[in-house]
Swiss-Prot record:
Substrate binds at residues 93, 109-111, 270-272. It comes from Aromatoleum aromaticum (strain DSM 19018 / LMG 30748 / EbN1) (Azoarcus sp. (strain EbN1)). It is found in: Cytoplasm. Involved in the heme biosynthesis. Catalyzes the aerobic oxidative decarboxylation of propionate groups of rings A and B of coproporphyrinogen-III to yield the vinyl groups in protoporphyrinogen-IX. This is Oxygen-dependent coproporphyrinogen-III oxidase. One of its GO terms (biological process) is protoporphyrinogen IX biosynthetic process.
Length: 311
C-alpha cells in the first residue's frame, strides 16, 4: 500500500490547473487573471479568474494549499475523532458561468486532505496521519439538450470505470445526485455527474488507487465539458433566456452558501474569501413563487431534467 505523498499530489494539481486554463483561454480568446496569494496562518494558492470574457461571463480555476493547526468544524462534524488535528488541505476547484444560456454552468473539484496528530507522544495507530481524497464534477444547464447531458455522463463514467468498474460509477453518480440537492427547494441543482469524499479515510484504501481515481476525474473534465460548449456557443438567445438563466443561477448561489462543504470549509478555515466566492455567478435574480409556463422550454428543464435518472 503506497504511503501518502502530498508533494506529488500538489504538483499534479498545479499541472491540472495550468492545463485546463490553457485550453479555456484558447476557447474563449481571453486571458485568465492570475493572482498568487499567501495565507498568513499557513499555505496559499493561485487564483485564476476570467470575467467578461468573449464566452465566459465569469469563471475561475483555483488552486489552494491550506495548512492549519486545527480542523474546522465543517471537516469534523462527521469525523469528531479528527478534532484538534493539524491538517493540510489542497485542491483545484473550478466553476464556469458562460454568458450564453444554452451553455451550462459547470463545476469540478479535486481535493486532498491529510490530518496529523499534533502530539508526537501519542502512540500508534492513533498518531498515524489520516488522509483522504474528494472531488467530482456536475453540470447545471438552463436550456438543456439531452445529447449534451449524455455526453457529460459518458465522460464521467469513463473516468471511474478503470478504478472500480460499474458499481463504483453508480455509487459516485448516485452520491452526486444526493449531494447537489437543495433540501429547502426539494429540487436538484442540476443534472448531476460524480461526487466522492473521504476516499481513503477508512485507513484501508491504497493511496495510489485513491489518487488514481481523483486524478482520472480531474483529467476527464475537458472531455466532459468542452464538446458541449463547442456545440452551443453560437446558439442565438434573447432577453427571455438571459432572464431565466439569472433566475436559475439563484439556485446555484443558495446551494453554495448554505450546503456546500468546500465553501464552508474554506470560510471556516480562514481561506481566501475572494477565491472561495469566485464560484458565484455575476448576474442573479430571485422572484417570489415563480412558475414556468406549462409546455415551455423552461418547464421542460423542470419536467424532464431536474430529477435523478440514468443518462
Amino acid at each position: 500500500m503506497g504511503a501518502p505523498d502530498s508533494r506529488v499530489v500538489r504538483q499534479h494539481l498545479l499541472d491540472l490547473q495550468s492545463g485546463i486554463v490553457a485550453v479555456l483561454e484558447r476557447f474563449d480568446g481571453g486571458r485568465f487573471r492570475e493572482d498568487a496569494w499567501q495565507r498568513p496562518a499557513g499555505g496559499g494558492g493561485i487564483t485564476r479568474v476570467i470575467e467578461e470574457g468573449r464566452f465566459f461571463e465569469r469563471g475561475g480555476v483555483n488552486f489552494s494549499h491550506v495548512i492549519g493547526g486545527a480542523m474546522p468544524a465543517s471537516a469534523t462534524a462527521h469525523r469528531p475523532d479528527l478534532a484538534g488535528r493539524t491538517f493540510e488541505a489542497m485542491g483545484v476547484s473550478l466553476v464556469l458561468h458562460p454568458r450564453n444560456p444554452y451553455c451550462p454552468t459547470v463545476h469540478m473539484n479535486v481535493r486532498f486532505f491529510i490530518a496529523s496528530h499534533p502530539e508526537a507522544a501519542v502512540p500508534p495507530p492513533a498518531a498515524a496521519p489520516v488522509w483522504w481524497f474528494g472531488g467530482g464534477m456536475d453540470l447545471t444547464p438552463y436550456y438543456p439538450y439531452e445529447e449534451d447531458v449524455r455526453n457529460f455522463h459518458r465522460a464521467c463514467r469513463a473516468a471511474v470505470l478503470p478504478w472500480g468498474g460499474e458499481p463504483e460509477y453508480r455509487r459516485l453518480k448516485e452520491w452526486c445526485d444526493r449531494y447537489f440537492f437543495l433540501k429547502h427547494r426539494n429540487e436538484p441543482r442540476g443534472v448531476g455527474g460524480l461526487f466522492f469524499d473521504d476516499l481513503g479515510a477508512d485507513g484501508k484504501t491504497d493511496f495510489d488507487a485513491a489518487f488514481g481515481l481523483a486524478r482520472s476525474v480531474g483529467d476527464a473534465f475537458l472531455d466532459a465539458y468542452l464538446p458541449i460548449i463547442e456545440r452551443r456557443r453560437d446558439v442565438a438567445y434573447g432577453e427571455r433566456e438571459r432572464d431565466f438563466q439569472a433566475y436559475r443561477r439563484g439556485r446555484y448561489v443558495e446551494f453554495n452558501l448554505v450546503f456546500d462543504r468546500g465553501t464552508l470549509f474554506g470560510l471556516q478555515s480562514g481561506g481566501r474569501t475572494e477565491s472561495i466566492l469566485m464560484s458565484l455567478p455575476p448576474v442573479v435574480k430571485w422572484r417570489y413563487d415563480w412558475q414556468p409556463e406549462p409546455g415551455s422550454a423552461e418547464a421542460r428543464l423542470y419536467d424532464e431534467f431536474l430529477a435523478p435518472r440514468d443518462w
